[in-house]
């Protein structure tokens, strides 16, 4: 039976300790004030991938490594097929089941929970793919940039427009992310 843990804690990757830590880190980001609402709005408006933001912030804020625009583009290409063929359809199905469930169809509650579990597990898989891809990349000193610029680059890649997000909003979200308290076991 699938674990239906609402937080995603049940989907840890035992064979990859860093991926497990990145997943927990992402759960912590999600709880920061305004991060969830902003990320969901960006997801709806621009096709923004929250797992990709978690990856960018993990690389920049936790690993303290730089990621350049070309690397952002290559990383996005690495997972775009997975995102489009697995994550997005799972998300669409979950949203549909939730909407149907809200119309007094309690038998869909279990279906909704299963679809949410599939979506979370698929997002975890994407994070693992991104982390493994990053580990395989040659790191070039001086090539990278800060988190704000990496997120801007990603937004311009997925939305085909570099200035869709208000600068203040971007700075605020990236500032929250950059200052998250990390667990001592990293």
Specify the residue positions occupied by each region the protein language model found.
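Aromatic-anchored, charged helix-turn/loop surface patch used as a conserved interaction hotspot
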Residues: 2-12, 69-134
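Acidic, glycine/proline-rich low-complexity segments that act as flexible tails and inter-domain linkers
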Residues: 2-4, 8, 26, 33, ...
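Charged, terminal alpha-helix-loop-beta segments
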Residues: 20-22, 46, 159, 174
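Short amphipathic alpha-helical segments and their helix-coil junctions
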Residues: 22-44, 110
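Conserved active-site and cofactor/substrate-binding residues in soluble primary-metabolism enzymes
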Residues: 30, 50, 125
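N-terminal interaction modules that seed assembly of large macromolecular complexes
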Residues: 35-80
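A charged, amphipathic interaction segment
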Residues: 97-177
